[in-house]
């Protein structure tokens, strides 16, 4: 009655997957080319639910891909280009072996190439999709831009990554999109808001580093190849939204200001323009000169109370954001040669400040250290020989902390030689019941407009409290001794009959405290009964939630106790030092 009976492993999940070797043979590609193709197209291996069935009863470790993904790759134009390149390499090797140099030149001129434009359009149908997926591209391009020009990576890739990252930084500066900065062990984390999307990326520190041997640079280079194409599309579109010329050009006025006397000493002619752009100290040229327009304001429509509250909250948030964009506006900074120039210049320019540095350090310095209009000089050394009275000498952390606090923090904590406050991460948001460090509480008080208590006053208060405690202890011991004496005197006069005081029930009295207590007892009883009436699943979930809350409370108490012990130890050390001095 039925059709032919199918053999084992010819139906079901066994037919949905294909091994890597079979897929490679189907596409007629080498393993390296197959990996490149999968990275570029976004095809990843899958772990089958029933691995033994898919592996036809074998338990040997194998990599599986979905069969539909491999069929999708069969029609990819890049596969043909990979085959052409393989033939090109074979012909080139033959020409080298026969010493046919004219043939070598001809082959090099006709080297097969390919573009990834169609893959980018296929993987990211809309511009917002591309923006959401740009975090990894930014981090990878910034990493490659810091590489030394050795044989590990192609020089063209490093140069391209450097150009694209400089274009991105100039866009963020012009649009003032930067929101958060954090200095970590890995590097500097930045977060910008671009067209409503929060984009976070990591920039490594500008240190000389050796290339690790346990990293596959071919895989990284393949990812970078795709990311640079994507990055180019995004930069072009973003520059269009701001009416900027792409590729970016300096404003004619700014370019004349940056014209150095001995420009050829700093960089070659081919690199000088990129160096000027990477200085981030000048404005970019626009397609059409923009006329200053009034700031866009939200229209007010008569709405219900909830909608009105939401609108007011949005207006307040927009005002705070506009104020944050102008955080350093009107300030003039000078960077000493020992501070990280690029990161500080990038951050300060993002918030409207003017920045300069020593002209012998880098192209782009617009004014000298002797300029009397400088308001802040950023220094990372214990002391300065020559200081000007009309400016603040601060450590670099003040800039990063002020950006995260969305306000200009007091400069007294960041003077030369002072112990810096801890650098708090802006990416950590405490929930109810979480441990909040005292420095964060102090910062929140500053944001509310409250004046924090000085440390010296706190120390004096602590000393006064300790003295009061000593006096109280003495009084308490004296009272205790007096009571003992009275008890011994009254022992002979005690009566044999004892009167026990009666207990009044809380519901029999009409006091406010008893009513509150009665309500609390009723609520506790209702809660207990509700827990008793829960189903088994609900009870399990409730117990899990309560266990999590208790665990967080224990952790908070542990951290608070550690902090208190640390503060007590530091206070004891200070007292010992004072006692030694006296």
Swiss-Prot record:
Residues 572-582 have a biased composition (Basic residues). Residues 277-329, 517-582 form a coiled coil. Keywords: Coiled coil, Nucleus, Ribosome biogenesis, rRNA processing. GO terms for biological process: maturation of 5.8S rRNA from tricistronic rRNA transcript (SSU-rRNA, 5.8S rRNA, LSU-rRNA); maturation of LSU-rRNA from tricistronic rRNA transcript (SSU-rRNA, 5.8S rRNA, LSU-rRNA); regulation of cell cycle. Residues 294-317, 445-511, 554-582 are annotated as: Disordered. Its main location: nucleus. Pfam families: Pescadillo_N (PF06732). InterPro entries: BRCT_dom (IPR001357), BRCT_dom_sf (IPR036420), PES (IPR010613). Residues 445-454, 478-490 have a biased composition (Basic and acidic residues). It is found in: Nucleus, Nucleolus; Nucleus, Nucleoplasm. CDD domains: BRCT_pescadillo_like. Residues 294-309, 455-477 have a biased composition (Acidic residues). Residues 323-416 form the BRCT domain. GO terms for cellular component: nucleolus; nucleoplasm; PeBoW complex; preribosome, large subunit precursor. One of its GO terms (molecular function) is RNA binding. Component of the PeBoW complex, composed of bop1, pes1 and wdr12. The complex is held together by bop1, which interacts with pes1 via its N-terminal domain and with wdr12 via a high-affinity interaction between the seven-bladed beta-propeller domains of the 2 proteins. The PeBoW complex associates with the 66S pre-ribosome. Component of the PeBoW complex, which is required for maturation of 28S and 5.8S ribosomal RNAs and formation of the 60S ribosome. Belongs to the pescadillo family. This is Pescadillo homolog. It comes from Salmo salar (Atlantic salmon). The lineage of its organism: Eukaryota, Metazoa, Chordata, Craniata, Vertebrata. The gene is pes1.
């Amino acid at each position: 009655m039925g059709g032919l009976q199918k053999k084992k492993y010819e139906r079901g999940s066994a037919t949905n997957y294909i091994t890597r070797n079979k897929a490679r043979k189907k596409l007629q590609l080498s393993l390296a080319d197959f990996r490149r193709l999968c990275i570029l197209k976004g095809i990843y291996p899958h772990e089958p639910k029933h691995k033994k069935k898919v592996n036809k009863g074998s338990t040997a470790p194998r990599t599986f891909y979905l069969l539909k993904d491999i069929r999708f790759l069969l029609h990819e134009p890049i596969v043909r280009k990979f085959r052409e390149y393989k033939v090109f390499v074979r012909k080139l090797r033959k020409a080298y072996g026969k010493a046919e140099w004219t043939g070598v030149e001809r082959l090099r001129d006709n080297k097969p190439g390919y573009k990834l434009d169609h893959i980018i359009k296929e993987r990211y149908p809309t511009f917002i999709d591309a923006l959401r997926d740009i975090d990894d591209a930014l981090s990878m391009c910034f990493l490659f831009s810091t590489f030394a020009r050795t044989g590990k990576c192609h020089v063209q890739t490093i140069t391209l990554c450097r150009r694209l990252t400089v274009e991105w930084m100039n866009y963020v500066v012009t649009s003032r999109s930067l929101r958060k900065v954090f200095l970590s062990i890995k590097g500097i984390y930045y977060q910008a808001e671009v067209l409503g999307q929060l984009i976070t990326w990591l920039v490594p520190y500008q240190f000389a580093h050796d290339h690790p041997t346990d990293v596959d640079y071919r895989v990284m280079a393949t990812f970078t190849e795709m990311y640079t194409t994507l990055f180019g599309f995004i930069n072009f579109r973003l520059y269009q939204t701001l009416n900027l010329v792409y590729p970016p050009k300096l404003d004619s006025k700014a370019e004349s200001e940056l014209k150095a006397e001995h420009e050829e000493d700093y960089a070659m002619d081919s690199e000088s323009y990129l160096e000027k752009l990477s200085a981030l100290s000048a404005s970019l040229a626009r397609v059409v000169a923009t006329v200053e327009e009034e700031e866009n304001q939200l229209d007010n429509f008569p709405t219900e109370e909830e909608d009105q509250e939401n609108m007011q909250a949005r207006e307040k948030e927009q005002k705070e954001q506009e104020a944050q964009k102008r955080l350093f506006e009107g300030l003039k900074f000078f960077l000493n040669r020992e501070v990280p120039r690029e990161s500080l210049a990038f951050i300060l320019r993002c918030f409207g400040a003017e920045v300069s540095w020593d002209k012998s350090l880098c192209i782009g310095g617009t004014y000298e250290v002797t300029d009397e209009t400088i308001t802040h000089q950023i220094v990372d050394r214990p002391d300065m020989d020559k200081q000007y009275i009309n400016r603040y000498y601060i450590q670099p952390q003040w800039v990063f902390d002020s950006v995260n606090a969305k306000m200009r923090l007091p400069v007294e904590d960041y003077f030369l030689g002072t112990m810096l406050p801890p650098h708090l991460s802006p990416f950590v948001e405490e929930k109810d019941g979480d441990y909040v460090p005292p420095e964060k509480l102090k910062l929140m008080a500053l944001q509310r407009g409250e004046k924090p208590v000085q440390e010296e006053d706190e120390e004096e208060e602590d000393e006064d409290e300790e003295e009061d405690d000593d006096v109280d202890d003495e009084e308490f011991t004296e009272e205790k001794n007096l009571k003992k004496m009275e008890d011994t005197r009254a022992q002979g006069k005690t009566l044999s009959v004892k009167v026990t005081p009666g207990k009044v029930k809380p519901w029999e009295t009409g006091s406010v405290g008893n009513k509150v207590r009665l309500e609390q007892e009723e609520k506790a009883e209702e809660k207990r009964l509700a827990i008793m009436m829960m189903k088994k699943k609900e009870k399990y979930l409730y117990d899990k939630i309560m266990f999590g809350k208790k665990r967080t409370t224990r952790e908070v108490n542990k951290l608070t106790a550690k902090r208190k012990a640390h503060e007590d130890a530091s206070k004891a050390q200070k007292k010992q030092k004072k006692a030694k001095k006296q």
